[in-house]
Amino acid sequence: MKRKDTLKDFRGKSIDQLQEAKIELLQQLFSLRMQKGTGQLKKNHLFKSAKRDIARINTIISEKNK
């Protein structure tokens, strides 16, 4: 159910808000990469969820641009 809630939230936002959310997720992904490199990361599943959310945002942005 969480994914559907996330999609509803993303679809309810404007393109500018989606761009901001995408930037935040990219920063989070960068932070996760740095933590993994230093051996501090314990939750590897966060990579997958961040990448998927970025892909969802990109899809919704392209849908709204049509």
UniProtKB/Swiss-Prot annotation:
PANTHER family in the record: 60S RIBOSOMAL PROTEIN L35/50S RIBOSOMAL PROTEIN L29, LARGE RIBOSOMAL SUBUNIT PROTEIN UL29C
An annotated Gene Ontology molecular function: structural constituent of ribosome
Family: Belongs to the universal ribosomal protein uL29 family.
Gene3D superfamilies linked to this entry: 6.10.140.1970
Keyword check for Ribosomal protein: yes
InterPro entries: Ribosomal_protein_uL29 (IPR050063), Ribosomal_uL29 (IPR001854), Ribosomal_uL29_CS (IPR018254), Ribosomal_uL29_sf (IPR036049)
GO CC annotation, single: cytosolic large ribosomal subunit
Gene that this sequence comes from: rpmC
Gene Ontology BP term (one): translation
Keywords: Ribonucleoprotein, Ribosomal protein
Protein name: Large ribosomal subunit protein uL29
Coiled coil: none
Superkingdom as given in the UniProt entry: Bacteria
Lineage, highest ranks first: Bacteria, Pseudomonadati, Pseudomonadota, Gammaproteobacteria, Thiotrichales
